[in-house]
């Protein structure tokens, strides 16, 4: 039997050098590590890793080749009260595995035990890692590096975006390949999108609870192998990586960046009753935040929390991010529940992972976007991330909805959000682009549902409608649900137009949820994380071409307004913005706080957004000059020259002089 050589302690993972494979695994508390390799018949062969450099276990297997399936058995104490849950009866996934063979099914054998260890062997049914070799011709690929001030983000799900698209070949719908298909790229270009932000593509598992209900994790925020692509989105699991890179290369040629939503806050091992896949059995005490009683700190709502202040876990996370940039040429990341990244355990701007990213010549050059909260005390950190990060701006989301749908927001508060929430983000040399403005996202109502439903309708999720937020700031305009009279449909359309205009013509970086531009509805489900079906897949056959054209025209208008693309904070008298009342006069202090919801926003001294958010038709006197309404509020060939605008109830219009 071939013996393992000592090998090298770096890099982490399994790496083929042309002659054999070097294996490395971090574990600070293990007493022994076995490499388990499986032949074509599924026969297991075990080797003790002979090298032990610090906390890195390593060994080199001569003559091993790509395609080899492997896993680990890690020996150490079973001391739950101390946070140690070693169980060598369980085959474990390499945290740095590039490909996984097998499915993460709900099975008692994939659990290590709660108070007492479960010593039943699970190698027969446990997923296996696969050694891969990486050769890819990037040709002349170069990152678009779109300036932040010109960035328009489109948040989409790999499968949901194209699975029902009639113009994309059936065999590639819902896959990585479809993202790079000319039909999809041309659509994004015509819409004006500069960055495609994908919900998680790293391999994830469906929670056992969902599997028992016949559901699955659709969004992907339940990671199990952070270096491996989710194989269900590939035409062939063996070629997933190249399919993904082909799509990125095609998007880059069209000038479109690719941003990955990445989950570095928890793992699919969930709480102590959850499955054992990898980290818990490799070094539970190091990888997770552990309470004094040995249980997990659940700062994520998912049962566990990764300890991103531990040096080895920081190295793991940094290596993962570098992998996606260097191997897949992604242009940035959106970090789920990103406050966890800064926990020490209190949140700090100089937390180890933030410092590692800041000091990395690769990661410091890509777009970094934080979801700036977690669910623990002190977890709401909007505006407090280091200068390299932009942040989801929930202040903007709530303000836009309250202003147009609940009518309870003063003009001053609305203007503050329109001006990139400078009270929140204008600090530490940050720019307006640090505010990622959104009206909707994957999590919550779609834009159409915001104007059709007052209440969430999540019964299909199997939790008796308890899940999902109740704070939606939505307005069904008098009837719960889709459809209705022509008057109702028109009022809802006007509200959608107002919200889209607010999003796409405000200062900051706009993020559009895929499907909002053509009227996609989830029928009132505001937490569709487990709905892999027609509720979430975009139905292109029912798309509103008029709304799509309206959205595209707004995006192209945005790109013409210097005050929005120059990415500089607006200052008094700099010519970027003037705030005027319905008579074209500067607003008084009282009007800002108590005045009617009527406002004129003059941008770059020649673009005017006139707003009437009251219930009545109102005359708005435009500033001096010759004004004409511009697309999408008027046709190119028949501009309306006007000095007074008859503002419809809950309406707005954009003019140019």
Swiss-Prot record:
One of its GO terms (biological process) is glycogen catabolic process. InterPro entries: GlgX_C (IPR040784), GlgX_Isoamylase_N_E_set (IPR044505), Glyco_hydro_13_cat_dom (IPR006047), Glyco_hydro_13_N (IPR004193), Glyco_hydro_b (IPR013780), Glycogen_debranch_bac (IPR022844), Glycogen_debranch_GlgX (IPR011837), Glycoside_hydrolase_SF (IPR017853). CDD domains: AmyAc_Glg_debranch, E_set_GDE_Isoamylase_N. Pathway: Glycan degradation; glycogen degradation. The record marks 443 as: Transition state stabilizer. Residues 460-479 are annotated as: Disordered. It catalyses: Hydrolysis of (1->6)-alpha-D-glucosidic linkages to branches with degrees of polymerization of three or four glucose residues in limit dextrin. Pfam families: Alpha-amylase (PF00128), CBM_48 (PF02922), GlgX_C (PF18390). Keywords: Carbohydrate metabolism, Glycogen metabolism, Glycosidase, Hydrolase. The keyword Hydrolase applies. HAMAP family: GlgX. Removes maltotriose and maltotetraose chains that are attached by 1,6-alpha-linkage to the limit dextrin main chain, generating a debranched limit dextrin. PANTHER family: GLYCOGEN DEBRANCHING ENZYME. Belongs to the glycosyl hydrolase 13 family. This is Glycogen debranching enzyme. It comes from Escherichia coli (strain SMS-3-5 / SECEC). The lineage of its organism: Bacteria, Pseudomonadati, Pseudomonadota, Gammaproteobacteria, Enterobacterales.
